[in-house]
From Swiss-Prot:
Subunit structure: F-type ATPases have 2 components, CF(1) - the catalytic core - and CF(0) - the membrane proton channel. CF(1) has five subunits: alpha(3), beta(3), gamma(1), delta(1), epsilon(1). CF(0) has four main subunits: a(1), b(1), b'(1) and c(9-12).
Keyword Transferase among record annotations: no
Enzyme Commission code(s) on record: 7.1.2.2
Catalytic activity: ATP + H2O + 4 H(+)(in) = ADP + phosphate + 5 H(+)(out)
Superkingdom per UniProt: Bacteria
Enzyme class: translocase
Record-level Gene Ontology MF annotations: ATP binding; ATP hydrolysis activity; proton-transporting ATP synthase activity, rotational mechanism
Gene3D superfamilies per the UniProt record, alphabetical: 2.40.10.170, Bovine Mitochondrial F1-atpase, Atp Synthase Beta Chain, Chain D, domain 3, P-loop containing nucleotide triphosphate hydrolases
Name assigned to this protein: ATP synthase subunit beta
Bilayer disposition of the protein: Peripheral membrane protein
Database matches in PANTHER family: ATP SYNTHASE, ATP SYNTHASE SUBUNIT BETA, MITOCHONDRIAL
Keyword Ion transport appears in the UniProt entry: yes
Family: Belongs to the ATPase alpha/beta chains family.
Length: 482
């Protein structure tokens, strides 16, 4: 949404270079950096053209350089540009739930206008130190493998790594469902520079799984903001801020816990790089913008916990050419509190969620934060799985019988642990027919302790597959016996 401006400050286009536009204003009436400018008129074919752009540079001689948020096709020199006097503003509040917006906060889901009572500018300062919640607390997701091995920080930032088809979307939807049902929270999804088809599929899957209520959008658990691959770099660079602004309202005004999904954080950096080059800035390492650290920081520093509520962010991270030293992912890593890595090997085994228990990390997994019992259990689980991984080559060549008694026991327990890390999801119920399970952290720790202590050595390993807590595994074992 761009605020409707009175025509008090009107400039004229002097140059159009792709998505970058130079505009001349009357002397003494230069718009401020980040102000939204509205260009409306008719193109050469007589068709209406309406473009919103954002001021990025003041060039001198009463000229500004702005970046367009939509295609500049049809713009010509001499066209009028009206200064709105404020940054781009987007609708906020419960009216946004269940709807899809573009970078300007305009609905793009063909469901009509949004009943907006309030809008907020997308450029806002990060919360001050005095407003921040400084004591780290664990955000319980109800997903065993995450809560035990890579606990999420309330108000933290988590990188989600995984190729196509290993279950990123399903984990995202389960988290959206669980924060709504267990924490009374809502979610915001910012689609930054990804495929339009994927955005469409995600929306339809959310309707199928009940995350979005098509008949009554106000009962939905998420708002979606899309700036897809085919859009100009200006839109892709700002859509993350549009989504974040909606999330901040839920946190600061509604005092809720919010999940913010950003897919993909690399595309945000990539768009900034494109814009930087078009603005004529000297490129930095590997061709990225010289302001890379500032750009990423401006987004990431606003994602945090305050005394009122929290924004916990899960960011899909594309690593170009699998090079972790590339400046884009390297800058992002500096802000992350944890990483959730999805493994194709586990997905091939049918173990979902396919979170890699050895490759995923969290800086919350410390005894003074999660407690000694949780920490010891998590490390024991990882040690057992690591030993199993080391023994797999021997098993493949010589067979299980060649192992020592102790190693055979380790393998048996590791296979049970691996299966117990799987879990039926609520959002997958419509596809699998298996009812979803929310497992508390207490039940999760107790279950893994019982497996590792040898209490359940006599139960078959298939009893641990796709169950919630350990009591369900015992009940399943009884059924299998019968």
């Amino acid at each position: 949404m761009v605020t409707t401006a009175e025509r008090t400050n009107v400039g004229f286009i002097t140059q159009v270079i792709g998505p970058v536009i130079d505009i001349e204003f009357p002397s003494g009436k230069m718009p401020a950096i980040y102000n939204a400018l509205r260009i409306q008129g008719k193109n050469a074919a007589g068709l209406d053209v309406a473009v919103t752009c954002e001021v990025q540079q003041l060039l001198g001689d009463n000229r500004v350089r702005a970046v367009a948020m939509s295609s500049t096709d049809g713009l010509v020199r001499g066209m009028e540009a009206v200064d709105t006097g404020a940054p781009i503003s987007v609708p906020v509040g419960t009216a946004t739930l269940g709807r899809i917006f573009n970078v300007l906060g305009e609905p793009v889901d063909e469901k009509g206008e949004v009943n907006i009572s309030e809008t907020l500018p997308i450029h806002r300062p990060a919360p001050s130190f005095t407003e921040l919640e400084t004591k780290p607390s664990v955000f319980e997701t109800g997903i065993k493998v995450i809560d035990l091995l890579t606990p999420y920080r309330r108000g933290g930032k988590i990188g989600l790594f995984g190729g196509a088809g290993v279950g990123k979307t399903v984990i995202m939807m389960e988290l959206i469902n669980n924060i709504a049902t267990q924490h009374g929270g809502v979610s915001v999804f910012a689609g930054v520079g990804e495929r339009t088809r994927e955005g469409n599929d995600l929306y339809n899957e959310m309707i199928e799984s009940g995350v979005i209520d098509k008949d009554d959008p106000s009962k939905s658990k998420i708002a979606l903001v899309y700036g897809q691959m085919n859009e100009p770099p200006g839109a892709r660079m700002r859509v993350g801020l549009s989504g974040l602004t909606m999330a901040e309202y839920f946190r600061d005004v509604n005092k809720q816990d919010v999940l913010l999904f950003v897919d993909n954080i690399f595309r945000f950096v990539q768009a900034g790089s494109e814009v930087s080059a078009l603005l004529g800035r000297m490129p930095s390492a590997v061709g990225y913008q010289p302001t890379l650290g500032t750009d990423v920081g401006a987004l990431q520093e606003r994602i945090t916990s305050t005394m009122e509520g929290s924004i916990t962010s899960i960011q899909a991270v594309y690593v170009p050419a699998d090079d972790l030293t590339d400046p884009a992912p390297a800058t992002t890593f500096a802000h992350l509190d944890g990483t959730t890595v999805l493994s194709r090997g586990l997905a091939a085994k049918g173990i979902y969620p396919a979170v890699d228990p050895l490759g995923s990390t969290s800086n919350m997994l410390q005894p003074d934060i999660v407690g000694s019992e949780h920490y010891q259990t998590a490390r024991a689980v990882q040690a057992t799985l690591q030993r199993y991984k080391e023994l797999q080559d021997i098993i493949a060549i010589l067979g299980l019988d060649e192992l020592s008694e102790e190693d055979r026991l380790t393998v048996a327990r590791a296979r049970k642990v691996e299966r117990f890390l799987s879990q039926p999801f609520f959002v997958a119920e419509v596809f699998t027919g298996a009812p979803g399970k929310y497992v508390t952290l207490e039940e999760t720790i107790k279950g893994f302790q019982m497996i590792l202590s040898g209490e359940l050595d006599d139960l078959p390993e298939q009893a641990f597959y796709m169950v919630g807590n350990i009591e369900e595994a015992k009940a399943k074992a009884e059924k299998l016996k019968a």
